């Protein structure tokens, strides 16, 4: 689940794996106290989302023009689905909510608890995210 969450913000599976490893390392080294399993799960999801956003921001700062990039041999990765690519193209506040709702099966109330947001805010982000997703997918078809 955490890997899928990291993948919604990152285009590289290796970066997503690194993020999840860093989150578990932080869990082991800081040893935070949790009230129950739900609290621990919420902490893991929130920390994964924050770390993935940090990595995505850092990647944007160190991007290299395509002409200057060196081509390295490697394994071919399967193309992500057009819908997943569109979800990843959304701003973080929308993609996180959409991913948790549709891919992880959380309710709006559960997402609000996980992200520490008011329930109406989550509903609004879900609605606006769907609309932006429609626009992105419509542009891809045209």
PLM segments and residue spans:
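Short, small-hydrophobic-rich alpha-helical interface motif
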Residues: 2, 6, 16-27, 47, ...
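C-terminal flanking helix
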Residues: 3, 24, 91, 95, ...
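Short, charged helix-capping/linker segments at alpha-helix termini
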Residues: 3-22, 32-38, 119, 141-142
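Arg/Lys-rich amphipathic alpha helix in sigma70-family domain 2
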Residues: 29, 35, 46-67, 76, ...
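DNA-recognition helix of helix-turn-helix
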Residues: 49, 53, 115-139
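Short amphipathic alpha-helical boundary/capping segments
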Residues: 82-91
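A short pre-motif secondary-structure segment
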Residues: 97-101
